[in-house]
A protein has these predicted regions:
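Extracellular glycosylation-rich, acidic/polar low-complexity regions of adhesion-
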Residues: 1-167
Length: 167
């Protein structure tokens, strides 16, 4: 007699290029977020849905500056919702009832952005790790580097229009 038992396999998250570049805005305008990896893929040999995923700043975290976010779009991402913890640098994505499909998870992970809110950013690179969970097992982390480029902003002086006198 031969007995076969099903074995749950890990989901797999695969990133594309190893580095994404972020550059500080020139002047005093707001910095622009960059997509961390627009080509990231998610697979799972024995599941068509996943329960959750985390995207974490696992290297170089600057809690007062760094922000991870994602664009929630129910037509392409189902019921995936997210929350970011700035202290830990972790963006947690969840699917109520673990019903979001692999394609929906892939769309959500592809929409994750990094931004630095400082106009004097720490220029150390950030390591961003993607992990998917099928409800039982978590994938091995897939990591990306975000390089940080600061821009020297010219000082500004404002003329108040008043006359200055000296006595």
């Amino acid at each position: 007699t031969v007995s076969l038992a099903a074995v749950n396999t890990l989901p797999v998250v695969t990133d594309t290029t190893p580095t994404t570049a972020w550059t500080e805005a020139s002047g005093t305008g707001a910095n622009t977020p960059v997509v961390v990896d627009s080509g990231v893929t998610v697979t799972d040999a024995d599941n068509t849905t996943l329960a959750s995923a985390t995207v974490s700043i696992t290297g170089g975290l600057q809690p007062a500056e760094d922000v991870l976010a994602f664009t929630s779009n129910s037509s392409t991402m189902g019921n995936i919702a997210g929350s970011y913890n700035s202290t830990t640098g972790v963006l947690t994505l969840t699917s109520s009832g673990a019903t979001a499909t692999l394609a929906q998870w892939q769309a959500a992970l592809r929409s994750v952005t990094y931004n630095d809110t400082s106009h004097n950013p720490n220029t150390a690179s950030r390591t961003i790790s993607f992990v998917a969970n099928d409800g039982t097992l978590s994938s091995v982390a897939s990591t990306k580097t975000v390089s940080i480029t600061a821009v020297d902003t010219l000082p500004t002086m404002t003329d108040t229009g008043s006359t200055t006198s000296w006595t």
